[in-house]
Amino acid sequence: MNIMITLFINMSLASLLVLIAFWLPQLNTYTEKSSPYECGFDPMGSARLPFSMKFFLVAITFLLFDLEIALLLPLPWATQANTMTPMLTTALVLILLLALGLAYEWLQKGLEWNE
């Protein structure tokens, strides 16, 4: 019963915060707000340069493998449990999934910098 009350309170607060976030912003846009700010000077050229998709893909790949490290960090503490089978199974499935993702990324030439 306590868990149901906790879930209800969490969902209510989350919904309330989402509603407040949609209600509060003022969408007044004008040229000063939408122009880039460069230390008080007018920009010499276009301040909105196109972003290379390669950098974006490398950043996303880095974040995925960084998440792997974050998920595997609790493993030393999990080894102190009486039954290690669920922990080892989960860890091996996670590592296998990420290794398959890395192999797929490699085969699709997503890790090569030259085009």
UniProtKB/Swiss-Prot annotation:
Gene Ontology CC: one annotated term: mitochondrial inner membrane
Reaction equations catalysed: a ubiquinone + NADH + 5 H(+)(in) = a ubiquinol + NAD(+) + 4 H(+)(out)
Name this polypeptide is given: NADH-ubiquinone oxidoreductase chain 3
Localization: Mitochondrion inner membrane
E.C. number(s) listed in UniProt: 7.1.1.2
Function field: Core subunit of the mitochondrial membrane respiratory chain NADH dehydrogenase (Complex I) which catalyzes electron transfer from NADH through the respiratory chain, using ubiquinone as an electron acceptor. Essential for the catalytic activity of complex I.
Source organism (scientific name): Dasypus novemcinctus
Gene Ontology molecular function: any one: NADH dehydrogenase (ubiquinone) activity
Subunit structure: Core subunit of respiratory chain NADH dehydrogenase (Complex I) which is composed of 45 different subunits. Interacts with TMEM186. Interacts with TMEM242.
Gene that produces this protein: MT-ND3
Similarity-based family: Belongs to the complex I subunit 3 family.
Record-annotated membrane-spanning stretches: 3-23, 55-75, 87-107
GO biological process: mitochondrial electron transport, NADH to ubiquinone
Keyword Translocase listed: yes
Membrane topology label: Multi-pass membrane protein
Entry keyword set: Electron transport, Membrane, Mitochondrion, Mitochondrion inner membrane, NAD, Respiratory chain, Translocase, Transmembrane, Transmembrane helix, Transport, Ubiquinone
InterPro entries according to UniProt: NADH_UbQ/plastoQ_OxRdtase_su3, NDAH_ubi_oxred_su3_sf
Main subcellular location: mitochondrion
